[in-house]
C-alpha cells in the first residue's frame, strides 16, 4: 500500500460488491458535517443524535446546532458514559425516545462518541422498526480507526460482552480528528493498540512510519494524527470490503 497524503480533508469510500456504500470523511473540525449529511437527503427527516454524558459536554451542542438547519427535527438521547450502560436497558430507553418523538423508518440516528456509543446506536438503528439509517461521528481514536467502520453493532447482556448484536452499515462516517485532543491518555493508548496492530498485520510500511513518527503521534500533532487515522482507515476499508462480516479476518500473535 502506498503512503497516504497529508490533507486537511480526506475521503475514503467503502465498497461492497464493487458498489460504493458509504464514505469515511476525515476533517479537523465539524464545519463540513452539514454538507456531508445533506448528501443523504435528510431535509425532510428527523435526526436523533445519540451520545454519552462525557461527549455531551464537549460536542453535542455544536453538532446539534450545525445539523438543525439540515433536518426536519433534531433531538438528542444522552445516556451515562461507561461500558456498563451498553445494554438492552439503555436501548429500551432509546426506543422509547424515538417512539415518543414519532420516528419512522425514513428517519435517522447519529452516533456521536466512542465505541460504546457507536455500538449501541448502531444496534438500535438496526432493530428499531426493522432497521433505520444511521451515521457515525466517532470521537475516540479506537472508534475512528476501527469500530465505526464495518457495520458491527451490539450491546452487552448481563456479564457477556457484545452478546446481542447485528451487522448494520452506516450511511456515513464523519471523523473530526481534533476530538482526539480532548481524549484521556488511557483511551488514546487503547486506540494506538489497534493502530499498531494494523501496521504489524497488514502493512509493514505503515508500521515503520509509526515507529519513525511515534513522538509526533503521542504528542497528538495534527499532521501525524491525520496521517495515522487516514492510513488506518484505508486498511480497515480493505478488510471490510474483502470480508464484510469479518468472519475470516483473525489476528494471531505468537502462534
Predicted regions and their residues:
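ATP/NTP phosphate-donor binding region
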Residues: 3-108
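Catalytic nucleophile loop
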Residues: 118
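Acidic-aromatic/histidine active-site loop/patch
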Residues: 115
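Amphipathic, well-packed alpha-helical segments that form the structural scaffold of globular domains
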Residues: 95, 193, 211, 233-237
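Short, glycine- and charge-enriched coil/turn segments that flank and shape catalytic ligand pockets
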Residues: 41-44, 68-74, 212-227, 242
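Active-site segments that bind and position negatively charged phosphate/pyrophosphate groups
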Residues: 217-255
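A glycine/threonine-rich phosphate-anchoring loop and its flanking beta-alpha core
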Residues: 17, 123-216
Amino acid at each position: 500500500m502506498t503512503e497516504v497524503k497529508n490533507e486537511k480533508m480526506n475521503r475514503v469510500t467503502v465498497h461492497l460488491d464493487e458498489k460504493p456504500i458509504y464514505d469515511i470523511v476525515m476533517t479537523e473540525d465539524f464545519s463540513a458535517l452539514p454538507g456531508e449529511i445533506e448528501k443523504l437527503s435528510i431535509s425532510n427527516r428527523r435526526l436523533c443524535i445519540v451520545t454519552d454524558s462525557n461527549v455531551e459536554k464537549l460536542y453535542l451542542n455544536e453538532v446539534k446546532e450545525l445539523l438543525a438547519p439540515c433536518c426536519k427535527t433534531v433531538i438528542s438521547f444522552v445516556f451515562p458514559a461507561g461500558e456498563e450502560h451498553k445494554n438492552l436497558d439503555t436501548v429500551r430507553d432509546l426506543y422509547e425516545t424515538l417512539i415518543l418523538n414519532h420516528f419512522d423508518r425514513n428517519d435517522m440516528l447519529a452516533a456521536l462518541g466512542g465505541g460504546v456509543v457507536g455500538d449501541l446506536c448502531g444496534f438500535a438503528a438496526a432493530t428499531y422498526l426493522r432497521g433505520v439509517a444511521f451515521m457515525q461521528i466517532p470521537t475516540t481514536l479506537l472508534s475512528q480507526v476501527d469500530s465505526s467502520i464495518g457495520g458491527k453493532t451490539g450491546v452487552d447482556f448481563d456479564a457477556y460482552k457484545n452478546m446481542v448484536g447485528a451487522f448494520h452499515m452506516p450511511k456515513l462516517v464523519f471523523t473530526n480528528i481534533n476530538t482526539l485532543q480532548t481524549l484521556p491518555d488511557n483511551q488514546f493508548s487503547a486506540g494506538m493498540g489497534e493502530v499498531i496492530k494494523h501496521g504489524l498485520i497488514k502493512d509493514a510500511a505503515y508500521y515503520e512510519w509509526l515507529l519513525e513518527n511515534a513522538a509526533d503521534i503521542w504528542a497528538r500533532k495534527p499532521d501525524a494524527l491525520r496521517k495515522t487515522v487516514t492510513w488506518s482507515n484505508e486498511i480497515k476499508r480493505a478488510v471490510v470490503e474483502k470480508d464484510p462480516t469479518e468472519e475470516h479476518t483473525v489476528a494471531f500473535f505468537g502462534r
